[in-house]
């Protein structure tokens, strides 16, 4: 009997089921469970009409029961030394309220240390200030962000980057398969010169970031660091590009700013990447073998002329560069349909599927002429229309 019980426990753990995890389906239960700490499994979308701040003082591991679940109008404030992890959550703010400030994860200035911050398989959007903000000199040994899309941030205050760490003392920051899209204040900002950082980005895409209106003050750098000669910065297979203007794809000058430290940049595509005042250029591993000139873009594909002509595996899986095409996928753009604020309308009987920008299907109807999208939350989506005679088209749209 003891062996049988042990075997069952092993199966539960292998399957990802955590013992003593609290499963929640309402915002009230979610708030109580998260404040209590421990493993919190979210089984349903969390509907919440007003901005709600949740104070965190204990280790907490938040995850979706399956796939991804929505979390509306939630603001986390970390107020003691904890490990914070969030996985499989679509976090956004639908409320028009101006206060409190729309920051997904906020660390007040008086917090001495936060042991770790982990974000995985998430989508974050419509936080008008930041995705993550640290106001003081908080020690943060590790930050990890993986398989995540961050978009439409900083619209209320473009002086803030999506990740705004100011003087926080971060030792290691790792980003893998992440897309930053329309983050007006830039991507990552640190002004701490005292702590050497091991900073790594692999398969990360920056699209239309760091180009807030000239009238706004603040950093326009995509990535910004203060001087520290012992720091190490690695960018591998990354795509950094500019903005959309009248559906034209224009690379803008983007900056990676660090006055000292060692940069390793390999197989990454950008236009006019400026790395300022490297400590010892003779020993830097700084390779930029790729150059690009922009052509045009529509919302189905982005065509870029590159040198060399074919390059592989650059950027996140959500917006990546393969050959000379970057975008969602190459399709036969022959089916005719249009998108209004409330529906997708096809001229032929079709199968219509709506995807989140991460690629997750969120709506589908078969053998129809139209599909209502009125219930979708604000955000970026893709629509695929496939007719019965094999014609297929994909378009991107922004639900406002």
What is each model feature region?
Residues 51-52, 71-77, 93-111, 125-139, ...:
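Extracellular beta-strand/beta-solenoid scaffold signature
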Residues 331-400:
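C-terminal outer-membrane/trafficking sorting elements
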Residues 1-23:
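Bacterial Sec-dependent N-terminal signal peptides
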Residues 64-66, 82-93, 113-126, 139-154, ...:
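Right-handed parallel beta-helix
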Residues 238, 257-331:
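Acidic, glycine- and Ser/Thr-rich low-complexity intrinsically disordered tracts
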Residues 25-31, 37-60, 66-75:
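N-terminal extracellular ligand-recognition/capping segment immediately after the signal peptide
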Residues 24-26, 276, 328, 339:
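Disulfide-bonded cysteine-rich modules in secreted/extracellular proteins
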């Amino acid at each position: 009997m003891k062996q049988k019980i042990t075997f069952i426990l092993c199966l539960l753990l292998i399957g990802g089921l955590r013992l003593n995890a609290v499963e929640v389906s309402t915002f009230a239960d979610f708030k109580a469970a998260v404040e209590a700490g421990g493993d919190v499994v979210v089984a349903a979308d969390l509907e919440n009409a007003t901005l709600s701040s949740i104070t965190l003082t204990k280790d907490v591991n938040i995850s979706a029961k399956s796939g991804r679940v929505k979390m509306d109008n939630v603001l986390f404030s970390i107020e003691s030394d904890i490990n914070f992890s969030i996985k499989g959550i679509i976090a956004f703010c639908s409320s028009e309220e101006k206060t409190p400030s729309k920051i997904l994860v906020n660390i007040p200035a008086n917090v001495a240390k936060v042991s770790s911050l982990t974000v995985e398989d998430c989508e974050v959007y419509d936080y008008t200030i930041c995705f993550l903000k640290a106001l003081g000199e908080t020690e943060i040994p590790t930050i990890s962000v993986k398989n995540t899309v961050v978009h439409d941030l900083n619209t209320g205050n473009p002086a803030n980057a999506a990740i705004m760490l100011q003087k926080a003392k971060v030792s290691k920051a790792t980003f893998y398969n992440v897309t930053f899209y329309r983050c007006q204040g830039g991507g990552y900002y640190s002004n701490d010169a005292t702590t050497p950082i091991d900073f790594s980005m692999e398969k990360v895409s920056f699209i239309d970031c760091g180009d807030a209106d000239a009238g706004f003050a603040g950093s326009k750098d995509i990535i910004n660091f203060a001087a520290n000669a012992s720091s190490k910065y690695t960018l591998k297979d990354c795509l950094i590009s500019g903005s959309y203007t009248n559906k034209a794809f224009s690379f803008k000058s983007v900056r990676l700013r660090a006055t000292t430290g060692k940069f390793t940049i390999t197989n990454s595509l950008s236009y006019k990447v400026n790395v300022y005042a490297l400590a010892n250029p003779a020993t830097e591993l700084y390779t930029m073998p790729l150059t690009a000139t922009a052509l045009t873009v529509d919302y189905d594909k982005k065509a870029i002329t590159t040198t060399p002509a074919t390059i592989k595996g650059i950027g996140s899986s959500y917006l990546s560069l393969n050959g000379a095409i970057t975008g969602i996928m190459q399709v036969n753009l022959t089916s005719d349909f249009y998108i209004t604020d409330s529906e997708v309308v096809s001229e032929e009987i079709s199968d219509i599927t709506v995807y989140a920008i991460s690629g997750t299907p969120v709506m589908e109807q078969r053998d129809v002429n139209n599909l209502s999208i009125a219930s979708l939350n604000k955000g970026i989506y893709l629509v695929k229309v496939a007719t019965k005679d094999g014609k297929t088209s994909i378009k991107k749209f922004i639900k406002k």
